Amino acid sequence: MREIIQGLLFVALGSVFGGMARFWLSGMVARRIGETFPWGTLTVNVSGAFAIGVFGALAASGHGVFSTPGPWLFAVTGFLGCYTTVSSFALQTLALARDGESLRAISNVTFSLVFCLIAVALGFAAARVLA
């Protein structure tokens, strides 16, 4: 029971920081670039994909910070789980499509998929080089 409560606390704490980081970064990007395209959400999701690539590579190595469950629960389940957002991506894409912005909607799907996959691969590679 103690491990479950401890795990919940790691996830909760990571979620608080992940949510605040998402709010700040997404808003900052939207204010600087504009809101005609969901650049803030795309930035958050791509940077989150890079981070999970790094964390995944560290976990796959079998040693280091992710050799115990606490850091993974905090960083991946909590922080990145709250930081990245598929639901906002889906809502913004639907809004673009419903507003007759089909090209922007398709671009959002394409950019998100391609850039997030590239970011995960780059994060994984960066962690391997640094390890």
Swiss-Prot record:
Activity regulation annotation text: Na(+) is not transported, but it plays an essential structural role and its presence is essential for fluoride channel function.
Alphabetized UniProt keyword annotations: Cell inner membrane, Cell membrane, Ion channel, Ion transport, Membrane, Metal-binding, Sodium, Transmembrane, Transmembrane helix, Transport
GO CC aspect terms: plasma membrane
Organism of origin: Rhodopseudomonas palustris (strain BisB18)
Name the record gives this protein: Fluoride-specific ion channel FluC 2
Cleaved signal peptide residues: none
Gene Ontology molecular-function annotations: fluoride channel activity; metal ion binding
Subcellular compartments: Cell inner membrane
Pfam family, one: CRCB
Swiss-Prot/TrEMBL catalytic activity: fluoride(in) = fluoride(out)
Membrane-spanning residues: 4-24, 46-66, 71-91, 105-125
InterPro entries hit by this protein: FluC (IPR003691)
GO process annotations (BP): cellular detoxification of fluoride
Family named by the database record: Belongs to the fluoride channel Fluc/FEX (TC 1.A.43) family.
Main subcellular localisation: membrane
Membrane disposition: Multi-pass membrane protein
Functional summary from the UniProt entry: Fluoride-specific ion channel. Important for reducing fluoride concentration in the cell, thus reducing its toxicity.
Gene: fluC2
Protein residues bound to Na(+): G81, T84
Top-level taxon: Bacteria
